[in-house]
């Protein structure tokens, strides 16, 4: 087994995981910004709806925060149980 191949696979995986986690964090931050801005717009239009809007905002935010956690789990899978190394070993017959 060529050690340079494994180093290349691990390096590419690390860079890819970093990009994926950054995109998930950015998406989550933008999502929270949009949710909160719409919440404030709703309160400005109908102040008496504040408790109901707050509940909906927190529920939607919780659902939105599930996505980065799923992405984090998948990223940890790629880092610690990299499926590409097994495929590379099988392809070269080692």
UniProtKB/Swiss-Prot annotation:
InterPro entries (alphabetical): ATP_synth_csu_bac/chlpt, ATP_synth_F0_csu, ATP_synth_F0_csu_DDCD_BS, ATP_synth_F0_csu_sf, ATPase_proteolipid_c-like_dom, F/V-ATP_Csub_sf
Spans through the membrane: 15-35, 61-81
GO molecular function: lipid binding; proton-transporting ATP synthase activity, rotational mechanism
Location of this chain's protein in the cell: Cell inner membrane
Membrane topology, from the record: Multi-pass membrane protein
Pfam families the record matches: ATP-synt_C
Disulfide links within the chain: none
Entry keywords, A to Z: ATP synthesis, Cell inner membrane, Cell membrane, CF(0), Hydrogen ion transport, Ion transport, Lipid-binding, Membrane, Transmembrane, Transmembrane helix, Transport
Gene Ontology cellular-component annotations: plasma membrane; proton-transporting ATP synthase complex; proton-transporting two-sector ATPase complex, proton-transporting domain
Ranges in a coiled coil: none
Positions marked as site (Reversibly protonated during proton transport): 65
Function of the protein: F(1)F(0) ATP synthase produces ATP from ADP in the presence of a proton or sodium gradient. F-type ATPases consist of two structural domains, F(1) containing the extramembraneous catalytic core and F(0) containing the membrane proton channel, linked together by a central stalk and a peripheral stalk. During catalysis, ATP synthesis in the catalytic domain of F(1) is coupled via a rotary mechanism of the central stalk subunits to proton translocation.
Subunit comment: F-type ATPases have 2 components, F(1) - the catalytic core - and F(0) - the membrane proton channel. F(1) has five subunits: alpha(3), beta(3), gamma(1), delta(1), epsilon(1). F(0) has three main subunits: a(1), b(2) and c(10-14). The alpha and beta chains form an alternating ring which encloses part of the gamma chain. F(1) is attached to F(0) by a central stalk formed by the gamma and epsilon chains, while a peripheral stalk is formed by the delta and b chains.
Family: Belongs to the ATPase C chain family.
Protein name: ATP synthase subunit c
């Amino acid at each position: 087994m060529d050690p340079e191949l494994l180093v290349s696979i691990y390096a590419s995986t690390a860079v890819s995981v970093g990009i994926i986690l950054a995109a998930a964090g950015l998406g989550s931050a933008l999502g929270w910004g949009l949710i909160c801005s719409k919440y404030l717009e709703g309160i400005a239009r109908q102040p008496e709806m504040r408790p109901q809007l707050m509940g909906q905002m927190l529920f939607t935010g919780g659902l939105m925060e599930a996505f980065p956690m799923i992405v984090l789990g998948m990223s940890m899978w790629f880092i610690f149980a990299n499926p590409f190394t097994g495929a590379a070993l099988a392809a070269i017959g080692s």
